[in-house]
Amino acid sequence: MATSALGAVLLTGCSLGDFGDINKNPNRPSEAQTDMFFTYACTYTYDFTLNSYYYNPWTQMFNGYVAERNTLQYGKMNILEFDTSSYYLYPLKNLKYIIDLNSDDATKNTVAVTRFGSNKNQIATAVTLQAYFYMHLTDILGPIPVKEALQAGEDNYTPAFDSVEDIYSYLDEKLKEAYALFDESGSLSSADIIFGGDVSKWKKLNASLRMLMAIKLSDVAESVGKSRFAAAYADGGIVDDGDSMIYRFDSNSPSPLYSNGVNYNSNFCPNEYIVEALKDYGDPRLFCYFSLVPFRGSAPVGDASDPAAYVGMKLGIPNVSDYAEKVCYFSESLSAAEGLLPIITAARVNLVAAEAAERGWISADAQSLYEAGVKASFEQWGAEDVDVYLASDKVAYAGTKAQKLEKIAMQRWLSGYMADGVEAWSDIRRLHVPVIEVGRPAVGITHIPYRMKYSGAIAASNKKNYESAVSAAFAGTNDAEHRIWWDVK
């Protein structure tokens, strides 16, 4: 696997720059300061936008957002092992400490605990963020330990793997319990680097996570998905851009895209799929997502107002270097020192709700939700002329039910650029919009991976339960050809 400064910082969850006390690992019970536990856990939240621990930007590559500029290494899509140990060891364990310390009579009223917020709000927020991590990990791999996870203190070092179906059910219940605990009359301290201590926004994320899971049941357990979605939608998810889950960097702890802008633009570039789709749709977000400026401070290499000047790289072709000087670059706004990385946005949640409405799962107007999702994305990126865009033939909400569902899926993909890559990949696996092809036959594959593979470390450390999970879910073969439980088409 390649190594570089980019690999060490851009895609490494534990090397985010100088966060001061944030980067001091507080993951020891003897340092029982729940605010530190929480902040440290939050530094892992953007891993599913720009994935952690790998130079390989698969969370943006599998979706047709990113390609390689100079070499064909990750475009082959054959580096597919995914390890979960860091997530269990750091964010998930930290969040468990928060729950335990706020539940224990001996600790819950100490200053080290209460300075972060009320016991109920801390527990509710920690459970919500745990569910966020577990949802993504199971959507990446399939069965993982959840119910018996984090029990090393109880001498359970080899937890059983839960099925995706059971995990979704368990997380939905835990999230509902957490939702009921939230007290909006209180707040969390500034140690909450995601929502600035705003409990109402954590409640909206809680309901949104339940919706994101429920919609994936459309092909495997529709009645269950419908019931869960309706309950979550009634509770109220993220519908306004100001409530989106965003990771915010600052000048003291700059965005890794800023710190590594030269390497990033040298090694990776916009994918042809997203560039050409935006041009084909006459989508003004083209000028927000991409740039013709190779490096900070340099002059553009074309007319920035001309859509034809923006060219993306084909995914997985062997001779990428032949096209390196022709393709465009990532937007300067993404690589600013005080840059933002979107995770779960109002655009996504509105468009997920539009799908639910179109399926008849909720009593809401699908077109209104669809248009609200597109408008939220335009607002997020500062794009103009959204009404003209919504009235265009390719975008206007019209046609058969199948055509409307395809339009919803397409707008989710167009708005998902550089946001939660695992969610975008889940959409493509489930809905097949758009169809992402790779540069076959040169790279020897015919489709994007259906899942990541368990790492060798997972197999070695929990062999019996690992083998049982692989046998039950994937016919005994740990590969990328088998599908996650909810992916059946």
Walk through the language-model features, giving the residues of each:
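Sec-dependent bacterial lipoprotein signal peptides
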Residues: M1-G13
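Beta-strand acidic-aromatic groove motif in beta-rich domains, primarily in extracellular
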Residues: L50-W58, G142-P145, K226, G421
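C-terminal beta-barrel architecture of Gram-negative outer-membrane proteins
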Residues: S377-E379, Y389-D393
